[in-house]
Amino acid sequence: MAVLKVIEILANSDKSWEDATRKAVKHASKTVKNIKSVYVNEQSCTVNGDDVNQFRVNVKITFEVS
């Protein structure tokens, strides 16, 4: 039987929500092994004038505990 754990990560990017999600996984993988899935819980962005300047994600990362 596998035991799974979920952590919540906030990340941002100046390119896209997808890039912010990739950054969250990359950063988490520095200390967490056996990542199985990512659930994008929330997306938001900041705006400067008439332009989006930061894409933000709140993700839940699931990994297997050995």
What kind of feature is each model-predicted range?
Residues 36-38, 65-66:
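Short, surface-exposed, polar/charged, turn-prone segments marking secondary-structure boundaries
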